[in-house]
Amino acid sequence: MFDRNGLRDMLARWPEFGEHVFETLLARRAWHEAEGHGVMRLIAPRGSRRAFEVRDLLERNLLPVRWYDVDTDAESAAMLDWLNIPRSETPVLVHATDVMLNPSAAQVARSLELRAQVDGQRFDLVVLGAGPAGLAAAVYAGSEGLRTFVAEAWAPGGQAGTSTRIENYLGFPSGVSGTELTRKATLQARRFDAVLSSFHRAVELADGPDGMLRVDLDDGQHVLARCLVMATGARWRELQADGVDRFRGAGVYHAAMATDAERARDEDVIVVGGGNSAGQAATHLASRARSVRVVVRGAALKSTMSHYLVDRIERSPRIEVMTETEVSALRGSSTVESVTLLDRRDGVVQDVAATAVFVMIGADPCTEAATGILAVDAAGYLLCGTGAAKSDGHLCWPLPDREPHLLETVRPGVFAAGDVRSGASNRVAGAVGDGGMVVRYAHEVLAG
C-alpha cells in the first residue's frame, strides 16, 4: 500500500509508469461513466433553470451526472413517487445514498467540497482563473517547485472547456475536446502539487504582510500571494432580445456541451455568433439536431472564424448561415419554442421554430476583483508590459529602476494571462503560452 507521498515519489522516479497510471485512471473513469456507475442522477423537468445550473457546475467540474426529465422518464417519476417527493421540490440530485431537494449550485459545491480550505495560507503564486492560461501557469509553476493555488469562480476550463472539439491545437491531429484538455490539465497541475479550488471567487485584492498580496475569497477565506496571475478570462455578453431573461437556462445557453447535442436530437436550434466557439458549437450540434441556424450580424463568417470551421459549416446540409441578421425575440411556455429573426438589410421579420438558442457573442473581461487596483484599456482589459508602463493617473507603474515585464500589470508581481489581458489572441494556444510565460517572469520577481 502507498500513501499519497509514497505514490507521488514512485511516479516521480518512474515517469513512464506514471503515464500508464494516469491513462488507466482516465480510461477507468470513462468506462464507469459510460456504464452509469457512480454517476449522479439529476431529476427535473427539461425547462428547470436550477437543474441546468447544477448540471453545468457538475459537468464542467468533471463530475459525472445525468439529467432525467421527470416528464418523459418513467423511472425517475416513479423514484420521486417512491421517495414521496413532490414535483415542486425538483430538481432532485441523487448521489450515492444522498438526496438533495431543489439544491442551488452553492449547496452542491459545499456538499461535494469543491472549495479548498486554504484560509490564511501563503503561496508563491496565486492564480485567479482555471482556463487554459491559469491551468498552464499552475502546471509550469508547480513543476518548478512554486507553491501554487488556483481559485476558479465556477469550473476549470474556462470558455475553452466547453468546446466540443478544438482542432487547431498543437499535438492533437484529430482534435481534442475542451473537457478532455481540461481533465488532463487539472490532473497534471495536481500532480505537481498545485491546489485547485472550484466555485471559489476572488472578491478583493489588498496589501498583505511582508510585501505580499492579500486575496480575499467569496466564502470569507483569504490567501497571501508573493506573486499573482490574473487569468480570469472573459464572459459572453448577454443577447439583447425580448424573452432572454425568461428563458436563461431554459432554452438560452452560453455553451454547447456534449449532452446539449443529445438533447437537441431531431430538433431545431440556433447559434448566435460568428467566432470559433460559435462555429464549433454549430458543427457539434449539427451531428444530432434536425437543423442549426447560425445567426450573425456581420456580412460573412470568414472575417471572424477559422477557415476550417467555415468550410465545415458550408459543407453541412443541416447548417444554415444567416448573415446580417439578429435575434429580436424568443417565445415559448416553459422553454423556448420559437425565435423571431430580423434581417438588418431590409427589416424583414420572420418567426422560426427553435428549442434552444446558444449565444456566443462578444465578451467582457472578468476584472471585478482588480477594480481600482490594476489599470485597464478602454474596453476594460488589463494593461500589461508597455501598456502598463505608459499608464498614467493614480494607477501607474511605481518602480523607477525597472520596466514591467511583458505580462506584468501596473502592480509589480501581478501578471495577466489569457483573454483578460489587453491584446490577447483569444486562442487556446495563446492563452497556454501566456500561462507558461508568466511563470518565467514570476521567477524573476521572486528572485528579487
Residue ranges and their predicted role:
Residues 1-21:
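Cyclic-nucleotide recognition modules
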Residues 20-28:
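Intrinsically disordered or compositionally simple regulatory linkers and C-terminal tails
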Residues 33-39:
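Short, low-complexity disordered segments enriched in Ser/Pro/Gly and basic
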Residues 39-45, 267-271:
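Short hydrophobic beta-strand segments
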Residues 42, 46-73, 83, 127-194, ...:
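Beta1-alpha1 glycine-rich phosphate/pyrophosphate-binding loop at the start
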Residues 72, 76-128, 144, 161-162, ...:
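FAD-binding core/adjacent interface of flavoenzyme oxidoreductases
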Residues 119-156, 240, 248, 254-307, ...:
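Rossmann-like dinucleotide/flavin-binding elements
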Residues 182-218, 222-225, 230-232, 286-401, ...:
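A Rossmann-like FAD-binding core segment of flavoenzymes
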